[in-house]
Amino acid sequence: MSKKGDSSDHLRCSFCGKNQDEVKKLIAGPAVYICDECIELCNEIIAEETEKGAVDSEFQDIPSPKEIKAMLDEYVIEQDHAKKVLSVAVYNHYKRLDTAFDSKDVDIQKSNVLLIGPTGSGKTLLAQTLARFLDVPFTIADATALTEAGYVGEDVENIILSLLQNADYDVERAKRGIVYIDEIDKIARKSDNPSITRDVSGEGVQQALLKIVEGTTASVPPKGGRKHPQQDFVKVDTSNILFICGGAFNGLAELIQRRQGEKVMGFGAKVQTKTDMKIGDLLVQTRPEDLLKFGLIPEFVGRLPVIATLGELGEESLVRILTEPKNALVKQFQKLFEMEGVKLRFTDSALSAIAKGALDRKSGARGLRAIVEKAMLDIQYEIPSMENVKECVIGEEVVMHGEDPILLFEPSKKKA
């Protein structure tokens, strides 16, 4: 009950001692009183403790590197080295955030990651799977769409805006999110000599990205954007955001081979040609100096201390990708057909044909879905209207030449 109107002089807040005339409200309890100011202070203390407890709980639940890799194994085939490197880097990153809350005596640097590998080798999938497993906000940006501020194109701050949107405008969650920047190799400068002219989509973009990658306070439009120009911009500290950059880096293997060739010159030196070594074996030996020669600026290379390389995927690997992961294409289509009461089966030769098609397109795992969708289009159109179909068998001819699949009907209802 409120005692604001009570004229008794002895009514005071039991916590701060102020009398009823010095506060807005005085709430009475059994032999005690509390004022509105003390209530507000108590609410602030409780909110701070609750937030700190939630953060502490979040960091105590960080999975170990082995647990992270085991989860990645469920969705990404092969690439064990990259998965191990990424697992350790992500674990250390979130432990670093934990340390930031508990200790101020050691400054642990952020472990941003550079993923190097051919198109369709699993770079984007690794980043997506990590973010989903860790339950943190995640966004993907295309480096080729970015330009320096003042030029037509996407500003680098838009990356943080996208992350904030995916965090439902929860700034604290966004500050612990993961950003994946794809096609990072496409913003390399044209030579390893500093440019004296404007490079709107190359060196200039690297300089712009450098600020948010190393840690800055980015100003992004509020919810509603330009519809509410009177609103203040939202400030997001990027110091604790994990940045994962990925690219195919075509031509990097040749730079590495050239560097190695210079060091093995002389009598009796064993020289390995490009045919002797796979591109993946060369990329594993990537050094910062190779990235500098490729066209990344020194400051940007320095902000990506962890390098993980992914190898090329062969036919056998692509077949495994079609069938083994939790989100495997074959499993997805089998589930869709199961909903129609039909068992779907792909022959081994059909799976090999799909894998070979992706290899011919030089698109890696990324090209698998387009090939499968094309092969399955007609039968997906027909099956819902057909009766008594028990099983559908997809053979090599369906994939290669668009022939009809084999349909097996219920024996008792099979028509002559």
Swiss-Prot record:
Q: Summarize where Zn(2+) binds, as residue positions.
A: 13, 16, 35, 38
Q: Does the keyword tRNA processing apply?
A: no
Q: Which UniProt keywords apply?
A: ATP-binding, Chaperone, Metal-binding, Nucleotide-binding, Zinc
Residues annotated as binding ATP are 118-125
GO molecular function list: ATP binding; ATP hydrolysis activity; ATP-dependent protein folding chaperone; protein dimerization activity; unfolded protein binding; zinc ion binding
| Domain ClpX-type ZB: start-end pairs | 1-54
Keyword ATP-binding in the entry? The reply is yes
Which Gene Ontology terms of cellular component type are present?
HslUV protease complex
Q: What does this protein do?
A: ATP-dependent specificity component of the Clp protease. It directs the protease to specific substrates. Can perform chaperone functions in the absence of ClpP.
Record's protein name: ATP-dependent Clp protease ATP-binding subunit ClpX
Question: Organism source for this protein?
Answer: Desulfatibacillum aliphaticivorans
